[in-house]
Regions:
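N-terminal leader/targeting segments and the immediately adjacent pre-domain N-terminus
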Residues: 1-88, 114-119, 151, 177, ...
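Structured C-terminal helix/loop/strand segments within mature extracytoplasmic catalytic/sensor domains
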Residues: 2-6, 318, 323-369
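Short, charged, amphipathic alpha-helices and their helix-cap/turn boundaries
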Residues: 45, 49, 72-75, 85, ...
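Active-site SXXK
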Residues: 69, 92-122, 145, 210-214, ...
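A short, polar/charged loop-to-alpha-helix boundary motif
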Residues: 80-100, 349-357
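Active-site helix/loop module of the DD-peptidase/beta-lactamase fold
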Residues: 92, 97, 115-157, 189, ...
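Active-site-proximal alpha-helical segments within enzyme catalytic domains
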Residues: 205-214, 255-276, 327-343
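Active-site Gly/Thr loop motif
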Residues: 238-245, 288-338
């Protein structure tokens, strides 16, 4: 039987937490239930492949594998380099950078505000830069922003020249140049390149526009941090999660959350369980489904994008958060699996990394239940 159409076909059911398996406890120690991988899954081989610095995946810092709600394998290696202190070895308590996986966390925050009745997906958003009468950007909806079909001109290019600069890249200028103090304003100031809704354009600027909308609702700076802690990271026990805000008080949701690998796995488990955590429905299950339904094909690499998440058409319902240098949280409902991989993989090796993730998912999906 061929896989269901990822755009229109039925979504596979999301598994519940198995009876007798406790939810991960709160606190910096992680306090995850642990278990063994199923018979026939050679996890040591798969982890060796990921952690071979001379192999196609390059530098892997952390891998955490959660099966049926239990950590069944994890591995840490390498050192984090910093300009102001000696390199530090990576371990279970090391906060690592999400890069664009933060976009998927923004999806959760928007879902909370939609459920609260404070945001409407289908009404034009209130963005100050678009408030002038007749501005065609004023018709852009939150739904179009989440799908990255807003039509705004934004160049997402991380290549640097010999002077470590890229003067044609909007994302470099936003994160590290003229836009760094107010990322939402920088991105919202971009002109239209296409009518809203017409085509897909992957854009970190789009995510930061959405984050600016959230900041105006919940309050910038510390109130925003508290909202993230009280409504998302705190309830799932992700004590290490640290979102970074810019000088304007906007969470740079395109790129910046530091957390341990196990705490990133908590976020994946929240989505695998349909927004439910330890007896509480934190996010509506219907909102989780908006992360699982493909809406666009990324013309740069053929991947399927939903709403700030990525969808794999493998017949297993797999969807994922992905970030620069190969960060990923892979969620597979059919295998009841969360796979976290963090590291520093150059973009020309992304196909090999996606292939490795697919091998891990397939190994668990094919294992006897």
């Amino acid at each position: 039987m061929s896989p269901a159409d990822p755009f229109t076909g039925p979504l596979p059911p999301l598994p519940v937490q198995p009876a007798g398996t406790p939810w991960p406890g709160a606190g910096p120690d992680g306090d995850w239930p642990e278990g063994d991988p199923p018979a026939g899954v050679d996890l040591e081989l798969l982890l060796d492949q990921a952690c071979d610095d001379r192999g196609p995946l390059a530098r892997t810092h952390a891998v955490v594998v959660v099966h049926r709600g239990r950590v069944v394998a994890e591995r840490y290696q390498g050192r984090l380099e910093s300009f102001d202190r000696p390199p530090e070895p990576v371990g279970p308590t090391t906060p690592l950078l999400s890069w664009s996986m933060a976009k998927s966390m923004l999806h959760a925050i928007v879902g909370l505000l939609v459920a609260d009745g404070r945001l409407d997906l289908h009404r034009p958003v209130a963005v100050p830069e678009w408030a002038t009468d007749g501005d065609p950007r004023g018709s852009i909806t939150l739904d179009q922003l989440l799908a990255m079909r807003d039509g705004l001109a934004f160049v997402e290019d991380y290549g640097l020249d010999e002077h470590l600069a890229n003067r044609t890249s909007d994302v470099i200028e936003m994160l590290f140049g003229a836009g760094r103090d107010d990322v939402a304003h920088f991105a919202a100031d971009r002109p239209l390149a296409a009518p809203p809704g017409e085509r897909f354009n992957y854009s970190s600027g789009t995510s930061d526009i959405v984050s600016g909308i959230v900041a105006r609702l919940v309050g910038p700076g510390d109130p925003y941090r508290r909202f993230l802690a009280d409504r998302l990271f705190g309830p799932i026990g992700a004590a290490s999660a640290r979102p970074a805000v810019d000088e304007a008080g906007t969470w740079v949701a395109s790129s910046y959350v530091h957390a341990t690998a196990r705490d990133f796995a908590r976020f994946g488990l929240l989505y695998l369980r349909g927004g439910r955590w330890d007896g509480h429905q934190l996010l509506p299950s219907a909102w989780i489904d908006t992360a699982r339904r493909a809406r666009s094909v990324d013309p740069s690499d053929g991947q399927l994008h939903s709403n700030h998440w990525w969808v794999t058409p493998d017949g297993l319902g797999t969807f994922s958060c992905q970030g620069y240098e190969g960060q990923s949280i892979t969620v597979c409902p059919a295998a009841d699996l969360v796979l976290v991989r963090l590291g520093k993989t150059p973009s020309d090796r992304y196909p090999a990394l996606r292939s490795w993730r697919a091998d891990v998912v397939a190994a668990f999906a094919q294992a006897p239940s």
